[in-house]
């Protein structure tokens, strides 16, 4: 799968599961990205559900993006997704989407929806 070219070369990231201590940085990215934001309680309520998963992208031990998605029987649904303003146009979002695509299965989940 190919995505549009970025203005700069992709940054090197570590993409991992979101953990509770990430919330301060995630909330900063959320508030800088959206007019109507999720609260910390919104994030936590969602992540407490068995089918809801969070991931973060880190560059040099700093969180530069996050994604919250739900697992459904035949698809993955992205609920919330943002990249820090200073990290945009560097392939962060594309790398996170590619990681999500890797989680698709030919037998079960075959699509990603927003």
Residue ranges and their predicted role:
Residues 78, 112-114:
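Conserved hydrophobic beta-strand within the GNAT/NAT acetyltransferase core sheet
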Residues 3, 8-10, 17-88, 94-107:
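Acetyl-CoA-dependent GNAT
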């Amino acid at each position: 799968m190919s995505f549009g070219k970025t203005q700069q070369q992709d940054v090197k990231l570590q993409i991992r599961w979101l953990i509770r201590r990430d919330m301060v940085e995630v909330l900063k990215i959320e508030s800088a990205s959206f007019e109507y934001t999720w609260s910390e309680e919104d994030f936590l309520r969602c992540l407490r559900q068995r089918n809801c998963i969070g991931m973060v992208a880190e560059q040099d031990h700093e969180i530069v993006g996050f994604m919250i998605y739900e697992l459904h029987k035949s698809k993955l649904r992205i609920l919330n997704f943002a990249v820090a303003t200073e990290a945009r146009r560097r392939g962060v979002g594309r790398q996170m989407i590619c990681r999500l695509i890797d989680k698709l299965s030919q037998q079960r989940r075959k699509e990603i929806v927003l």
